[in-house]
Amino acid sequence: MPSSQRWNTMSSDRLFVYGTLMRGFDHPMARLLAGHAEFLGEATCRGRLVLVKHYPGLLHSEAPTDLVHGELFRLSVPEELLRELDMYEACGEGFPEPTEYLRQLVDVTRADGATEKAWTYVYNWPVTGLPRIESGRFLEH
């Protein structure tokens, strides 16, 4: 079961992004991430993507063929950056429940096959009627 979004010193300084926070997006939060995190490479996590308006939502999946493609970063100041990203994603303490996203630790696989834990934002609202991004790649939708 994924870990909750509460920060502690035993948590990961890794962040897996799969949508508008990826490199190349001209978005203020993508620029913040690019300026305060080290790009570690492309990565995948088990899950499915749905299109929510103009942005994606990641859903958990146990099926080995369900992969979401994205990018892995090492955060320079994890606690501060995650707080900023939580505000952007409107999740965590102080936001009405249920929040649209939950920040959770997931297993990600790097291009070299190594796996590690990373934070990501998992979609938390009903998905009825939302189109699935079959490729698992937001940029290909």
Residue ranges and their predicted role:
Residues 2-141:
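Glycine-aromatic micro-motifs
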